[in-house]
Curated annotation (Swiss-Prot):
UniProt superkingdom: Eukaryota
Stated name of the protein: Protein O-mannose kinase
Transmembrane segments: 21-43
Keywords, alphabetical: Acetylation, ATP-binding, Endoplasmic reticulum, Glycoprotein, Kinase, Membrane, Nucleotide-binding, Signal-anchor, Transferase, Transmembrane, Transmembrane helix
């Protein structure tokens, strides 16, 4: 009797996977992982931050606080807040890094009684405009001329380039993050123009350094309005317009309508200077955005796509300038378009 072949008795042995096929499978897996990483890098939203609006009016929550706390009173500010060192000074306030219940906080003190009206105006705006776009108020004492706010260690927006040059922040030094900062800035302007306190104009903005000093850079790399001492009201219905200060302004950073219109032959007189509206803030958007975009790979590409809206912002006729909402929507479209283009290129490479 003829013997059956051994392999027929035991069934077919499992086939070995050719090395080339295994390599292709590994490459496919790596491409999938790379795609997911790119998808996260370009599309994932920022880590959310605590919004003070989650607390009732007159309350706050910072850091790891689970519950909202009422604004601190004069007595609490005097006894619970420990002043550490001065970290800033302006015409209206001196700012001190301080400590409250193991939280780093910013204590602002009035510089001189001559500036008290501006100080109280800033306090009123800070109280009334609390929300995602404004630094968190922790307490105040009008008797002592003090205001307590949340402390942000990265400081003023003026420090942006210095901060992004640090090695630990290189991962956020991209055109995507910088364009998002520009969107934050325009969002703040849009909020001020449609605030619960009416249309407010950011008057402390006569040059680039002064403008940047009005805002804070958070550890989450977003922007907050911080100095609200000069936010006059525009009311188009009643014809109420504004003038930013009582001195003659110069340069091309300020809007044309902020310049003395009667030539060098006539000395400046405040009572003859025409007033203006919130469109002066729109004029300044391209210059602020250009600073925020910096000079890194991809920033000129973003500038190119923003050229038309920025040209409109620089219209000599205020009424022809876009609104802050128009600018914000254009920024969002540009961000989406460029992000999709980069993702498409990344997919083609995989």
């Amino acid at each position: 009797m003829e013997k059956q072949p051994q392999n027929k008795r035991r069934g077919l042995a499992p086939r070995e996977v050719p090395p080339a096929v295994g390599l292709l499978l590994i490459m496919a897996l790596m491409n999938t992982l790379l795609y997911l990483c790119l998808d996260h890098f370009f599309i994932a939203p920022r880590q959310s931050i605590v919004d003070p609006r989650h607390c009732p009016y007159g309350h706050f929550r910072i850091g790891q606080m689970k519950n909202c706390s009422p604004w601190l009173s004069c007595e609490e500010l005097r006894t619970e807040v420990r002043q550490l060192k001065r970290v800033g000074e302006g015409a209206v306030k001196r700012v001190f890094l301080s400590e409250w219940k193991e939280h780093k906080v910013a204590l602002s003190r009035l510089t001189s009684l001559e500036m008290k009206d501006d100080f109280l105006h800033g306090l009123q705006m800070l109280k009334s405009l609390q929300g995602a776009h404004v630094v968190t108020l922790l307490g105040y004492c009008e008797d002592d001329n003090t205001i307590l706010t949340e402390y942000h260690p990265l400081g003023s927006l003026s420090n942006l380039e210095e901060t992004l040059n640090l090695s630990k922040y290189q991962n956020v030094n991209t055109w995507q993050h910088r364009l998002q900062l520009a969107m934050d800035y325009v969002s703040i302007i849009n909020y001020l123009h449609h605030s619960p306190m009416g249309t407010r104009v950011m008057c402390d903005s006569n040059d680039l350094p002064k403008t940047l000093s009005q805002y804070l850079l958070t550890s989450n790399f977003s922007i907050l309005a911080n100095d609200l001492d000069a936010l006059p009201l525009v009311n188009h219905s009643s014809g109420t317009l504004v003038k930013c200060g009582h001195r003659e302004l110069h340069g091309d950073f300020v809007a044309p309508e902020q310049l003395w219109p009667y030539g060098e032959d006539m000395p400046f007189r405040d009572n003859l200077m025409p007033s203006y509206d919130e469109k002066i803030d729109i004029w300044k958007i391209p210059d602020i955005s250009s600073f925020l975009l910096g000079h890194i790979e991809g920033s000129d590409m973003v500038r190119f796509h923003l050229f038309d809206i920025h040209k409109a912002c620089k219209s000599q006729t205020p009424s022809e300038r876009p609104t802050a909402q128009d600018v914000l929507e254009t920024y969002q479209k540009v961000l989406d378009t460029l992000r999709d283009a980069v993702m498409s290129q990344a997919r083609e490479m995989l």
